[in-house]
Every structure is written in C-alpha cells, then in structure tokens.
Amino acid sequence: ESADAFAAQFGVKAYFDKYEEFLENVDAVYVASPHLTHYDYTKQSLYAGKHVLCEIPFMLSAAQAYELYDYAEINNLVLLEASKTAFCPSFNHLVTLVKSGVIGDVVDVKTSLSKMVSAPTRELDVVQAGGAMNEHAPLALMAIIKLLGKEYSDFDFHSKVENGVDVYTKVVLNYPH
C-alpha cells in the first residue's frame, strides 16, 4: 500500500516487493543497502546473470569477495566495488601527476575520513557491521594504494573500540621505498 502511494506520488513506473521479481526486470544492479545484505544481494544478482556494482564495504570477509569475484569472472559478469572516487577524473588526474614525479618522491601519504554520529545508529552497531573500518577504510586505503601500490612491506592497526565497534582506526602501511 505504501509502495503504491510512493510510486503514484513520484511517478515510479515499476516497483517490486520480491527481489527475484526485481532481478527479472533489470540488466544490472547497484547494491546500496545495509552492510549485512551486500553479500546476499550481490550473490543473488550475479546468479541471476546481472552485472553488479556494490557499495562499500564491498563484502565483510575476503572469502565472500573471492567467491563472488570468481563467479563473476567465470560467468563473464562485471562485479565492482562502487567506489566513485576511483573513477573520478580529478582524482585520476591527481594520481597521474603524483606518479609523473612532478612533485618529487612521495614518502608519506595521509588520508582521513570521519563522520559525526550519535548513538543509536548503524555506524555504531556491531550487529549491523558498523565501525570506522567498514565505513571509511575502503576509500582511504584506495587512495594510498592508487598512489603507492599494493606492495607494502608491513602494516599496523591502532583502534579505539567501544561496545565492540571501532569508533576510531588508524592504519599505517609501510612501503619498502
């Protein structure tokens, strides 16, 4: 009933109350749902033969990511983390400039992302896979890896945990250069 009213108010031509029915009517899927649903929605979409962009955090375990990437590759499907920054022309221009050496040798990169939230909220709920790492690390680490690569020699994590959720995490990647 509320879906009918919403569709009428905003001119939505098609809407579904079953995910399977939705999948029958699209060519690709953009998963931007609560963290705990990313794996299931992405897997269902791939198994229905759909290309998928999935918001961060992409998956909550490496095993889930490998499983879905392998399936997508075998079935010739596109599966990407929906990191808009990675494809932003200005960010890629910055990466090109840095790698060209025009500013000299890069010896240190610092990125920081933060968000003010008040409990209770998904970001502070361990049951909903909240926490600083799940919320912000993919974007911050993507910038460093784009600039310096994946061949870091060591890493350290420093976190402040409250109620089972990291409310602050600092990641230090050490590179051999």
Regions found by a protein language model. Name each.
Residues A5, F10-Y71:
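Beta-loop-alpha module in the N-terminal Rossmann-like domain of NAD(P)-dependent dehydrogenases
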Residues F16, Y30, V107-K110, D156:
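Residues embedded in well-ordered beta-strands within globular domains across many folds
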Residues F16-D17, C54, E81-S83, D156-S159:
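Short loop/edge segments at beta-strand edges and connector loops
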Residues L23, L46-Y47, E73, K99-V102, ...:
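Residue-level signal for alpha-helix termini/capping positions
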Residues P34, P57, S83-K84, S114:
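Histidine-centered beta-alpha loop that forms part of the nucleotide-sugar donor binding/catalytic region
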Residues Y66-K84, D105-V109:
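Rossmann-fold dehydrogenase core element
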Residues T85-S153:
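Predominantly a Rossmann-like dinucleotide-binding segment in NAD(P)-dependent oxidoreductases
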Residues E135, L141-H177:
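Contiguous beta-strand/loop segments that form the cofactor/metal-binding neighborhood of enzyme cores
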